[in-house]
């Protein structure tokens, strides 16, 4: 007989009937404090885009001769990209589509899944879209540290061309140090992120202000006709430049993804009062400088200041890009943790690096994989401008998925009128698709990299998801109904022994294989038996009073369901404590045994996935982290019993 190994849920994501809503009702003072904290985390990526964005827009490779009209056209596109994509789409619309206060592609996917029946085609399409968007985020997590740090260190070339040969070694050294310190956590140094980024934004704002004071005519670029005329006059070349303009928007997704940490209001305040004004001042300042001195296009950001200030600016820019990289690395850790609980990624080691901040985690496998790929990218592409195409495709794809999932939420969850949803989402999608198409024109110049990486990641995640689905089907098809089995067992009960036995199960209605093997080999039944199932709800957090449900089957046998949100980490010690409180049952841990099933998965000709994907799933399953480590089960109280499972 073969049943599946205990996992989190019968379906990939369980829908709670009702759950307390997690919101951020911040008072004014708290909102301001959180706004400054958000400056150091949320806006690092988009805040460092001035280092390379306009430099790429005016690259000679685009084939557009320099002119004042070209400057006005590009700056106009930058202004309206901020207005439409960031301010209107993300800050005012998408951030409303939060999952109990939590943002991000997987949280939005979980919210959209509530609108589709389990197992339906619509449910599968939502899952595939969300997973692909998440996979493209990993491309962003690789390219952001590479292009950001590289562009900052390239400022040394402004000081002297002799320093060019040091750019790559210094960049690699900074990145290696950044990834090596992840295991120690960033709780202490993280307190400096906010002040450093505030200095950064004030600095780039003043740099731009100095330039626009000398040439205030650049403010005429707020007229959208300059952007429209530029695109019409330059046709294909203008469209290619549009793809480069998108670089000013990289990091916009972070405003939504990090919403759960700070809340909507602090992020909106930070964007409208500090970040957007400083960024626009810098971009308009670069444009004003171009009008006065076209030669500054070679490295406009660092040429905005006198030569004596270039080296301090390189230091500040490097610090800002490291902070931006840290934010995206932490985002990769958080998203991977969510993906594990939602059933898309195998269990892997997760270590909390702070006793006070639950969201600060470290994942060794993710960390070292990112470091390897980031170094490969830096050494392969060599210059920040060579990474521009790859960066744009990674981010635009994620943005399009976010727009599509938000459309489902607007129509089905918010019950907006179909015509209104079509108009709003149609407008946003038109802009998103224009940016994507513009970036796809440069697919051979590096745009292939995030697409290849995303496709490989998508294959692994969907293989894991579908493989677990086959295991659940196997358990249902071959399982023994729990109540009937216990009733039959109690008619001729085996010898009862002292102590408590807790069996993890994937299905509360079926007998876990570890229980069957214990009866078969040991011929005993503990005086107290618990069948425990851990389920993940499609909300970020669950209150402790809603976490445990217990059913007494009589004869000292209990069925327990423990529920967690996708931003939480299941903890056996906490579950035991809550069982004791909810049912007045006492546990002696030295007299309690935890039984797990350690299965061997075998690929067969049984209809399911393609044979090569089944073998890939078997390999992933055997190399996944141990359940006992994931649930924090004491090693000296653990009993593992093996079983063979065919898929």
Swiss-Prot record:
Transmembrane domains' residue ranges: 32-52, 74-94, 124-144, 166-186, 193-213, 230-250, 271-291, 300-320, 322-342, 361-381, 390-410, 418-438, 443-463
A single MF term (Gene Ontology): potassium ion transmembrane transporter activity
Broad class of the protein's primary localization: membrane
Keyword Cell membrane: yes
Alphabetical UniProt keywords: Cell inner membrane, Cell membrane, Ion transport, Membrane, Potassium, Potassium transport, Symport, Transmembrane, Transmembrane helix, Transport
Catalysis performed (reactions): K(+)(in) + H(+)(in) = K(+)(out) + H(+)(out)
Bilayer disposition of the protein: Multi-pass membrane protein
CC annotations in GO: plasma membrane
A Pfam family that the UniProt record links to this protein: K_trans_C
Cysteine disulfide partners in this protein: none
Subcellular location as annotated: Cell inner membrane
Sequence similarity: Belongs to the HAK/KUP transporter (TC 2.A.72) family.
PANTHER family, per database record: LOW AFFINITY POTASSIUM TRANSPORT SYSTEM PROTEIN KUP (PTHR30540:SF79), OSMOTIC STRESS POTASSIUM TRANSPORTER (PTHR30540)
Biological role stated in the UniProt entry: Transport of potassium into the cell. Likely operates as a K(+):H(+) symporter.
Protein name (database record): Probable potassium transport system protein Kup
Encoding gene (name): kup
């Amino acid at each position: 007989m073969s049943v599946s190994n205990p996992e989190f849920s019968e379906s990939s994501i369980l829908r709670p009937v009702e759950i307390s809503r997690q919101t951020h009702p911040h008072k004014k003072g708290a909102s301001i404090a959180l706004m400054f904290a958000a400056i150091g985390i949320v806006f690092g990526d988009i805040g460092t885009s001035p280092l390379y964005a306009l430099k790429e827009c005016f690259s000679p490779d685009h084939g557009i001769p320099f002119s004042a009209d070209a400057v006005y056209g590009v700056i106009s596109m930058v202004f309206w990209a901020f207005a439409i994509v960031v301010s209107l789409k993300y800050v005012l619309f998408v951030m409303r589509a939060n999952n109990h206060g939590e943002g991000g592609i997987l949280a939005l996917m979980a919210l959209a899944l509530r609108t589709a029946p389990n197992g339906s085609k619509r449910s599968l399409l939502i899952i595939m879209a969300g997973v692909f968007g998440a996979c493209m985020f990993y491309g962003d997590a690789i390219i952001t540290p590479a292009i950001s740090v590289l562009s900052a260190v390239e400022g040394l070339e402004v000081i002297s061309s002799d320093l060019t040969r040091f750019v790559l070694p210094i960049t690699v050294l900074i990145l290696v140090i950044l990834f090596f310190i992840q295991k120690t956590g960033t709780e202490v140094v993280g307190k400096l992120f906010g002040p450093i980024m505030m200095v950064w934004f004030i600095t780039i704002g003043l740099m731009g202000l100095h330039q626009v004071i000398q040439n205030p005519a650049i403010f005429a670029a707020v007229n959208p006709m300059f952007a429209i005329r530029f695109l019409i006059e330059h046709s294909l070349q203008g469209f290619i430049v549009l793809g480069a303009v998108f670089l000013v928007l990289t990091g916009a997704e972070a405003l939504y993804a990090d919403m759960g940490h700070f809340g909507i209001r602090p992020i909106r305040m930070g964007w409208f009062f500090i970040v957007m004004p400083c960024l626009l001042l810098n971009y308009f300042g670069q444009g004003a400088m171009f009008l006065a001195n076209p030669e500054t296009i070679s490295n406009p950001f660092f040429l905005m200041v006198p030569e004596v200030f270039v080296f301090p600016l390189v230091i500040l820019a490097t610090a800002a890009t490291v902070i931006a990289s840290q934010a995206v690395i932490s985002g990769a850790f958080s998203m991977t943790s969510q993906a594990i609980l939602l059933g898309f990624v195998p269990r892997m080691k997760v270590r909390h690096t702070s006793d006070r901040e639950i969201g600060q985690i470290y994942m060794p496998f993710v960390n070292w994989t990112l470091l390897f790929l980031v170094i490969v990218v830096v050494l392969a592409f060599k210059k920040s401008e060579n990474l521009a195409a790859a960066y744009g495709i990674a981010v635009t794809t994620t943005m399009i998925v976010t727009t599509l999932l938000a459309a489902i939420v607007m129509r089905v969850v918010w019950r907006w009128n179909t015509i209104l949803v079509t108009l709003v989402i149609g407008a946003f999608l038109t802009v998103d698709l224009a940016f994507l198409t513009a970036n796809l024109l440069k697919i051979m110049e590096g745009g292939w990299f995030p697409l290849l990486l995303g496709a490989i990641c998508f294959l692994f995640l969907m293989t894991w998801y579908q493989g677990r689905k086959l295991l659940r089907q196997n358990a249902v098809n071959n399982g023994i109904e729990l109540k009937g089995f216990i009733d039959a067992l109690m008619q001729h009960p085996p010898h009862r022994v002292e102590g408590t036995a807790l069996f993890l199960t994937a299905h509360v209605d079926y007998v876990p294989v570890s229980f069957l093997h214990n009866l078969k080999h040991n011929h005993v039944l503990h005086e107290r038996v618990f069948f425990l199932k851990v389920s993940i709800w499609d909300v970020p957090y669950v209150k402790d009073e809603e976490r445990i449900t217990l059913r007494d089957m009589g004869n000292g046998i209990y069925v327990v369901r423990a529920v967690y949100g996708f931003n939480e980490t299941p903890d056996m010690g906490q579950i035991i404590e809550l069982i004791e409180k909810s049912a007045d049952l006492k546990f002696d841990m030295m007299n309690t045994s935890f039984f797990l099933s350690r299965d061997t998965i075998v690929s067969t000709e049984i209809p399911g996935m393609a044979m090569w994907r089944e073998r890939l799933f078997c390999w992933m399953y055997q190399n996944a982290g141990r359940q006992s480590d994931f649930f924090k089960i004491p090693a000296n109280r653990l009993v593992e019993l093996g079983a063979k499972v065919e898929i």
